[in-house]
Amino acid sequence: MESRGKSASSPKPDTKVPQATAEAKATPAADGKAPLTKPVKKDAQAEKQEQPAAPGPATTKKTPAKADPVLLNNHSNLKPAPTVPAAPSSPDTTSEPKGPGDGAEEDESNTGGRGPWPCENLTPLLVAGGVAVATIALILGVAFLARKK
C-alpha cells in the first residue's frame, strides 16, 4: 500500500514500482522477513537526492535582489533628484563603508537568520529588574532564616 502512495507522488512511477516489487518478491523467499524495509530506504534516498535540487534555485534568487544603499536609507516620499544618474553604477564599486544603516543586516534577518530583538531598549530594564528581584529574594531569605533562629 505504501508503494502505491509513493509511486503516485514520484515523477517516474513506472520505473520505481517494478524494482520494488521484484525486490519484495526476492527477499521473502530468502529471509522470510518483511520485504518493505529495503524499498522504503531506497525511496527515502531518492527523495533526499531530489530535495537538494529545490533549494539551489532559491539561493540564486537572493543574489539579484541587492538594492542601492542610498535608496535603502532614503525614508522620504520625495522622488530622487535628477542629478543622481552618475551614482547608480554598481553598488559593489562604491567605497562607502558598510554600517548598520545600509540594510545588509536587515536583509539577512528576513531570511530566517536571528535578527535584533524588537524591544532592544527594554533589555537593560529587564536586567535591572532581574537583579532587583534577586536582591529582594536574598534579603527575604536571610530575614526568614534569621527569624527562625
Swiss-Prot record:
Q: Which residues carry this modification: Phosphoserine?
A: 10, 90, 95
Output this protein's name: Cell cycle exit and neuronal differentiation protein 1
Query: Where are the compositionally biased (Basic and acidic residues) regions?
Result: 40-50
Task: Name the gene for this chain.
Answer: Cend1
Cite the record's Polar residues compositional bias ranges.
1-12
The membrane-spanning stretches of this chain are 126-146
Spell out which residues lie on the membrane's Cytoplasmic side.
1-125
Segments on the Extracellular side according to the record's topology features: 147-149
The alphabetical list of record keywords is: Differentiation, Membrane, Phosphoprotein, Transmembrane, Transmembrane helix
Q: Any idea what job this protein has?
A: Involved in neuronal differentiation.
Instruction: List, in alphabetical order, the GO biological process terms annotated in this UniProt record.
Output: adult walking behavior; cerebellar granular layer maturation; cerebellar Purkinje cell differentiation; negative regulation of cerebellar granule cell precursor proliferation; neuron differentiation; radial glia guided migration of cerebellar granule cell
Q: Which organism is it from?
A: Rattus norvegicus
Q: Where in the cell is it found?
A: Membrane
Q: Which domain of life is it from?
A: Eukaryota
Q: How does it sit in the membrane?
A: Single-pass type IV membrane protein
Region (Disordered) location = 1-118
Residue spans of biased composition, Low complexity class: 20-35, 80-97
User: How would you summarize the oligomeric state and partners of this protein?
Assistant: Homodimer. Interacts with AHI1.
Provide the primary localization. membrane
Recorded family membership:
Belongs to the CEND1 family.
Q: Which GO CC terms are listed, alphabetically?
A: membrane; mitochondrion; vesicle
